[in-house]
Amino acid sequence: MGKKLRTYYAKSANSFHGAITNREHLDKVATLARRFGAEIGKEKAAGVAGGVHDFGKYADRFQGVLSGTHQGVDHALPSAAELYRLLDLRTTQRVWADGICAVEAVAGHHDGLIGMPQMQDGLEEMLSSDDWDDCPSGKMPSLHGQEEFMQAEEAFARDFPDFHMQRIQGKRSRVQGRLEDMLDTRMLFSCLVAADYCVSASDDDPAYLEKNSRPPLDAEAMLKKLEVHCAHLRKTSTADVSVNALRNEVYARCGEAGEQP
């Protein structure tokens, strides 16, 4: 008889459900993230982020977390490293700007956002070094080194035999500190984290999304409320003048973008 293939899990069983496979979780999060991303014109990037955000759970150390034999394991950063590899961001001169945003969103979906310049060297070392353990979270990476990543890639391929990396918008140079890229990262991050949370909550309560959905947005009414709120903040803010100037610029840029088709 052939060797039995291992099943990798994303969540252990509780009083609401049995153990949930990583395949099921990734598929559901990718689907919901695409739905959220479509609302901001980032359907593909959000779907890609959702589809690999827990790649790092294809790992003995993370499976040990579920069984109680391990703790302090970071699966998010190895997931980001795999997406970084899939997008070939280490070799391209003019990178997929949305790809970088997706990597940043995946890396931060549990412990907070980190910019690509701050983590790129670590991602590359994690992919190649069996000894790398310098996660910003202070935890042990669920995967490190070529052998562990290769085993995880084989398990992922068994779960998703038709997977292929989608083209994520057109190539353009990414300028350090550009507001548009910063906002793109945060919007993708929001899509991913919301999808991840909603899927997990729906595992416990299948009616979660229906219960927590809101009526269609009345954009004009909400914009008026936002303008009143922001006007009050400008009058009463005690923050540094330069910080407020940056906030006003972000607000103005968002307004300008909102006027575009």
Pin down the residues of each PLM region:
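Short glycine/proline- and acidic residue-enriched helix-loop micro-motifs
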Residues: T236-S237
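Accessory nucleic-acid engagement/destabilization modules that flank
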Residues: G2-H17, N22-L233
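N-terminal pre-P-loop "Q-motif" helix
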Residues: N22-H25, D240-P261
